[in-house]
From Swiss-Prot:
Keywords noted in UniProt: Coiled coil, Cytoplasm, Developmental protein, Nucleus, Wnt signaling pathway
GO-annotated cellular components: cytoplasm; nucleus
The name this protein goes by in its record: Dapper 1
Principal localisation: cytoplasm
Domain notes: The C-terminal PDZ-binding motif may mediate interaction with the PDZ domains of DSH (Dishevelled) family proteins.
GO biological process: Wnt signaling pathway
Subunit structure: Interacts with dbf4, dvl2 and tcf7l1.
Coiled-coil portions: 19-47
Superkingdom in the source lineage: Eukaryota
Amino acid sequence: MKPIPATPDHLGQHQESPRRKDKGEAESERQRTRERLEATLAGLAELGYLRHRQELLVKSALTPGAPTHGDTATRAGDTPRSLEEKFLEDNILLLKKQLNCLRKRDAGLLSQLHELDKQINDLKIDVEKTEEHLETDSRPSSGFYELSDGTSGSLSNSSNSVFSECLSSCHSSTCFCNPLETSLNLTDGQAKSADDFLEWLDYRDSQHETGTVRRSFSAPHSNSVDVAADVHPKYQCDLVSKNGNDIYRYPSPLHAVAVQSPMFLLSVMGNIKAEEPEEEIGPNDNDDCIVPELDHLKDEDSFLHQSSLCSLPLSSGKKMDGYILSIIQKKAHPVRTNKPRTSVNADPGKGILRHGSICVKQTGGVSQSSTVNLKNSKQTCLHSTGMISVDNSTYPSLKQCSKESLSEQLESKRMPSISTYPSCNVNELQSQNNSRNTVKSVCQGLARGSVAMTSNVQKENVTPNAPTNLSNASSSACNGSPRESTQMSALLPQEIKVVPPVKKISPKNTLLSYHASSSFDERPPLDFKSEGSSSQSLDEGLLVNAHYIPAQQQGVKLHKNIKNVKIVKSSTLKHRANVQYVAENGSQTLKEKSKAVGKKCRFPEDLDTNKKVKKSTPRTKKTSHPNFEPAVVGRNPVAVRSGIKSHGQPKDVVLAKPKHKRGDYRRWKSSAEISYEEALRRARRRAQREMMGVYAQVPFPYASPYAYIASDSEYSAECESLFHSTVVDTSEDEQSNYTTNCFGDSESSLSEVEFVGESTTSSDTDESGGLIWSQFVHTLPMQATATAELQTTAKAFVKIKASHNLKKKILRFRSGSLKLMTTV
């Protein structure tokens, strides 16, 4: 019986699979019927042989005529004895050969085969159920079950499994009869019960002793001529029960019945053509082969086979191997589900966490201004920072940042506002409109309305409106620290409602306009935690209360600041920040004064204005700073502590949290695989070494040159916190490329622009000049559309004194300042 191979058509074509299945079932049914008929014929032939042999025995006993009872008994005894001797000799030879064959076999193979039979039993049951289910199932067939049907060569029903166990035990009992191997290779699509077989076993137990054979001529393995001609030799071997205790001798009535049983049929199927002609032995030869005296060979009786079995051990072994291989193949190719073995982590938070500047939380602003929606805040955040704003759920740390930003905003609202802002508001509105329309307008607004913006922001801080807070939020978003970014995002929603047109502007213009608008619109208290002292100086500047300064005056000083920037030389932003912390407590106060009370971070315009304000009114700085001191403490205790440490004056304490911020930034950097701490330490060391020199360069007209520089230059760093501080720190170490690349292109470009605008004003008095880089970047996009003032400022920006590596990169990519960091 040939198994039906699983062809692609069978596996894939829905229409043909049922047709092929039906065809296979019909063929298997015909095969089973054929086998059953053959088994029945074999049983009948065996019974006929037994009857014929019995007749011969009776005739032999009665032939002498009428001898005396004793003579008859004696002759009968002599005749059987001579026959028994012959049979015994032949059987002994066969047994020896079989034992030799068994020695060559691996004993473990038989046990494994037995286990496989058990497994096959389970498989047969499963296949049986599956086939029944598939008959009514519209799903395409995989071909696995078709392979297992009656024509595929696998045992598929409980009867077969039971009988296969029998055969396996027979095998273990050294039964080399081909039926074993054939049965192992046979398959049946019909479920057949083993009850009949069990009944036969019980009947045999009642008739015979277990494992013993009566001393009679019915025992020998012999085939009549009819049997040899009509019955396949596979039906002419002994059947052994699964436990090996029950043996059905070939020429016995029970054997004939068992051969006809469906179970036996299934177990024996498929081996017909494997038999060799030697099995077709005449009745006389077979009678000679087996003798009743084999009873004493009880253990060896289980090995009794046809005389030809001894010559077939090799073929039987091959069949067994083939059967085992077939089982292994079927078990080695189980049906597999389409479910992917691995799950793809689509959590955007993990990838975003690597970019510290991306972490911007915008929910904080919602509470302050219900009119602003998160979407607008996100867009504003993107424009200001050039980064993707992250949802609150993305960063757990952002939640804390948003909370802090809210508290800071509330405090900023509480802060007293300076009464000199009406004109500033007008200027601010104009600057906002200009920034919305064009970058040029934005540049003009920056020149004219930085002070106005600052004063206006102070007003806004006093009022419950969150626009100032939004500005702070945006600036904090520019900063890399998660907390600051969160604050920025919180504030951005409100600020957005004022600056929505900025979205329409081109990337560079948008950034510039956003800076202008944010600086003009609001200077909300934002904690910019740039690395090193930049964040501290920014915070100080935020805390300072500044008197309103006319926009024109601010513009004039802006030019001056730019010139100063050219002159100033600082190794890094951090260095400048350190100098500012040490020497610019007073200037910081002035800067803060120029800023709105609630402002924490300053935009480039505000920074310049603050510087000018500080220069022009150091008194105001000093006076206003005390007003901010409580707010500073309330807003950010950590910043206050850091400010106290750096300045030694709680009054001048800045909200900046350099260490804490550095920790946050380092955390982001570590996720981006950037060793930020090392760069920061190097920047600090450089700043300390150059602190004295930078300090000398700082304009002393301000009571606290540090406050001026720190607020401006460090504000730039703060706004750029993640990006700029990282660039500065690493650029000195010539690692800016790596750091910059870690940030997104949009992120770095946006941060760059913002930083430029901010550091334009801040680095005017920036002794270290480390922040001039950002000024340069900011002014480059502004120069095209900026006024003459901005153009002059741009020139100053061109001469940036940052790390040599950073400066080189900036000059190289002047035209594409937005893409400076990413391209570098």
